[in-house]
């Protein structure tokens, strides 16, 4: 038997992080009973985003063009390359108002339990970017979680022998913390106090 439209909507809403069956059911009923125009806008926005948004060819963040605005900006320092896990982390770095270099967004972290290794993260693309002859320093701004640390260690081991300077943001970011939840002042301090990796 095919699921009903309501069941399909509830199941679709469950794909969102932190949304379980009960929350998905409440959302579905709210959209259908109280906010059908909102449901239409939501559906249209999701469809538009899926059709228009892709990955930047240089930094791997989300963009509607081939190259994002940050990568296209002549005001950014091309000698600095900050590696972050997600676009949200990149936005947090921008909010510090202290970093004016370029970015590379991993779109994840090394997590063997989740089946994510260096190949799945596309670290070969990061390597190509870091060794382009322009980048002088790679700043690792992965989260201070076990997976973020493993990712930073792997990238350091990959780049250090190639002569690229590799630094890590300081531990102003709490151990086990994620950049998304760190205030911009703490993140700015961590960025200023970054350290050389691999020593």
From Swiss-Prot:
Protein known as: Recombination protein RecR
One GO molecular-function entry: DNA binding
SUPFAM superfamilies: Recombination protein RecR
Zn finger intervals (C4-type): 56-71
NCBIfam families: recR (TIGR00615)
A Pfam family annotated for this UniProt entry: RecR_C
Gene3D superfamilies associated with the record: 3.40.1360.10, 6.10.250.240, RecR Domain 1
HAMAP family found in the cross-reference section: RecR
SMART domains given in the database record: TOPRIM
UniProtKB keywords: DNA damage, DNA recombination, DNA repair, Metal-binding, Zinc, Zinc-finger
């Amino acid at each position: 038997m095919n699921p009903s439209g309501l069941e399909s909507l509830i199941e679709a809403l469950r794909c969102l992080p932190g949304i379980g069956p009960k929350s998905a059911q409440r959302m579905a009923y709210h959209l259908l009973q109280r906010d059908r125009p909102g449901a239409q806008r939501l559906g249209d926005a999701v469809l538009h985003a899926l059709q228009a948004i892709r990955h930047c060819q240089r930094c791997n963040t989300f963009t509607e063009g081939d190259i994002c605005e940050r990568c296209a900006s002549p005001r950014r320092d091309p000698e600095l390359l900050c590696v972050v896990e997600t676009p949200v982390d990149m936005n947090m770095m921008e909010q510090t108002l202290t970093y004016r270099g370029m970015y590379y967004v991993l779109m994840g972290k090394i997590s063997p339990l989740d089946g994510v290794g260096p190949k799945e993260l596309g670290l070969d693309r990061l390597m190509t970017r870091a060794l382009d002859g322009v980048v002088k320093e790679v700043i690792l701004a992965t989260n201070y979680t076990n997976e973020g640390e493993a990712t930073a260690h792997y990238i350091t081991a990959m780049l250090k022998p190639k002569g690229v300077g590799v630094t890590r943001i300081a531990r102003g970011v709490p151990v086990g913390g994620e950049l998304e939840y760190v205030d911009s002042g703490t993140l700015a301090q961590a960025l200023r106090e970054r350290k050389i990796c691999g020593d």
